[in-house]
Amino acid sequence: MSFVNSHSSRLNPILFNLLKSLVYFSFSGSVVAAESHYDTLIINARQGDISTATSWFDGQSRNRVLTAAEVTDWLQINGWAGKDAEVRRIWEAYSPTMSLPDPALRAAAKSYRNLRQWQPSVALWSRVLQRSPRDDDARSGLILTLADAGQTKTALELAESRVKREPTANHWRELAWVQRIAGKHTDSLFSIIQAMRYAPQDKALRYDYSDILSSNNVSAPALNALENGKLHGVQTDERQRQRELEAAAELVRLAFIASTTENERFVVADRALARYSALMNQWRTHPSAKASYRHARIDRLGALLVRYRMEEVISEYQSLLKEGDIPSYARRWVASAYLYLQQPEQAEQILSAVIQEDPSQRLQIARQGDFFYSILESEKVEQATQLSVQAGEKTPYKKSVYGLSTFIPNDDWVDIKYLRIQSLISHNDFPAAQRLAERLAFTGPGNQELNIRLAEVYLSRGWPRRAETLLKRVELLEPRSFRLETHQGLTALELQEWRQLEQLTDDTVTRYPDDFSVKRLARLRQVHHMAELRIAGAQGLKSDSPTKGMNDTEIDAVLYSPPFADHWRVFSGGSFNQSDFSDGQATHRTLRGGVEFTDRDHWAEAELSHRNFGLGSDIGGRLSYRHDVNDFWRVGLNAERLMRSTPLQALKNGVTANGAGGYVRWRQSERRSWQADLSHGWFSDGNRRQEYALSGQERVFSSPSLVIDFTPSLSVGANSQQNTPYYNPRKYVAVLPALAIDHLLYRHYQTEWHQEITAGAGRYWQKDASAGAITQLGYGQRVRWNDVLDTGVSVQWDKRPYDGKREQNVSLSFDLNYRF
């Protein structure tokens, strides 16, 4: 053996061990370095450097097969970054061939939930719980995912059972979340309060508390909770603005609730307007707050409506409409504003559009009345009636309230009955309206509003004393009710209780100046205080009767002063009559003046006149008086020197007459009345004239726009002398059954346009002359405007016998009553 060889064989084991050690330490160092780099990637990822880690994993996955731990970290890091689609891709790539730990399953389950893929998310949470039944995070994920998936029943069962076992802050919080999703907002509020009891300093809980308060419409505390729960460095501008809007909207809702005291009824609305003003000033210049600014403008409409700033509501609505759609609740406010401003067509158009978009709102809108009145005041009476009937059929008399074992009376049912009463009145069916109103009032004697509605019906039927008695009786329930005082004021106007009218109107106008019914009362009082002009005239077009002559002209005008000292008015006027008779033309001129007195149950006029006629002139006078015994009976008396009904042909021939008369009227209601008249005239030529008449009115037919009355009349007269220079039948009897038709052509609140038709056919008997038929036909039109103008024009054709010969008379007449 050589040295070399022998030496070499001795060195080989030493070299081998040395080389082995060098290789080991070199490999260990590289492993340690690799592990250190990996840990740094994970730590940096947790601190926000996501892209470096994900890039490394992506590169490594192309070069080699990743380990289960690496896949898990890759899933979790992408989950931290919110890259749910990437998490899903990685999971679906590795899970079929690799057994991954629970953190990987949790990361994938969260991403599936975020991607709204409920079924795989629920399956993954369930797998985690199968492996680790006590994994609380996985149970939370399962509960919340089930709730998001709409499986609220199962989610509630799991959350409730867990909170019973372990009532922690987080468990109560998650139960509140599930209850909120399930629509159990009250329960969710209770649960979040329990959570805060366990962790009162947890600001994140206050965030959830704010959200749940908001979902329960407890807006102001929700805003406070958000303020108290703000986390450092967390941007909450959008959520803050939302809470600010909700708190202001809550004030608007409260503003619509009637306040317990008059002085406070606008306090809440004013607070809402002030709050909106501050918010809008703050958000106006911020582009990010553009949507919130518009939302504030929309909700502000409700506060403006409560404050009766109707023009502003309309103006702001039109401005908002140019910028986009407006939610239905705000459009309903706008409809109310249009209705208040007496623009019912606009209100109906808006509400019809709201109902068309959401038919489920129809019944609710109908119950509130605006839709009904917008249709009714647009003169679509049948449609309004149908609406009230349909709403009544769907509104029960009693309703159930959560938490009560018994049913309670339904206020909506009463409101619908009010609408039904109004529809019956609009149909001119006052008896049915009275029966319904009495049934409501008599079954609720302690309800002042029901009795006020009944009094309103009584007043509409011409029974002010009956209405007064009823209103006085219910005054004890709420003496200062402005609705009560308003109707008492209207009743006082009908009863000529002028001082009472003044006091009630002053009080209601001071307290509720913007209420529509109060403004109506104030308007009627204003009209009462105006001067009044009355003009009436007639022109014969074709006549050959001995009473009218030919080409006859009549005109009479009188001007009344405004009332003074409550009861008094002075008046002055004149008249002109002229006609052609067989013995020449006759002319009669009158100037007159006097005083009028009105008081409760009494009316009187005293007049002095200067009359120029025939062969000279003379001084005349008149006293007229009437007394209302009650709502049904009235008696009247009058006495005249140079009575106005003296035939014009008699005056032409120097024959004058004095007269006296009276009448008794019985008026049951607007549907029936009868009157008996008598008059006696003493002529200067010795003739004595006596006349008696009985006339009546019986309602035959009524509808919203058409009224037909049967108006029979019976006249009897006698004169003591014959062969006078004027028509003077010795005795006569006239019977004339007739119909009077009143057709409403147009109506818009206090503006009305009617056409009137009269037709009659009867018989006339005259002593010492043959009997003959009476035929009568008339057509006219009448306009009433704004409570101050009432004027009409008509054409009449009449044909009847005079001394046995039938003569005709065609004339055109007009009348005007104007207050200014």
Regions from the PLM with identified roles:
Residues 35-49:
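Short N-terminal segments immediately surrounding and downstream of signal-peptide cleavage
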Residues 50-86:
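N-terminal, post-signal-peptide region of Sec/Tat-exported proteins
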Residues 40, 69, 73-79, 84, ...:
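Gram-negative and organellar
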Residues 132:
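Extracytoplasmic metal-acquisition and chelation regions
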Residues 1-35, 285:
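Gram-negative bacterial Sec-dependent N-terminal signal peptides
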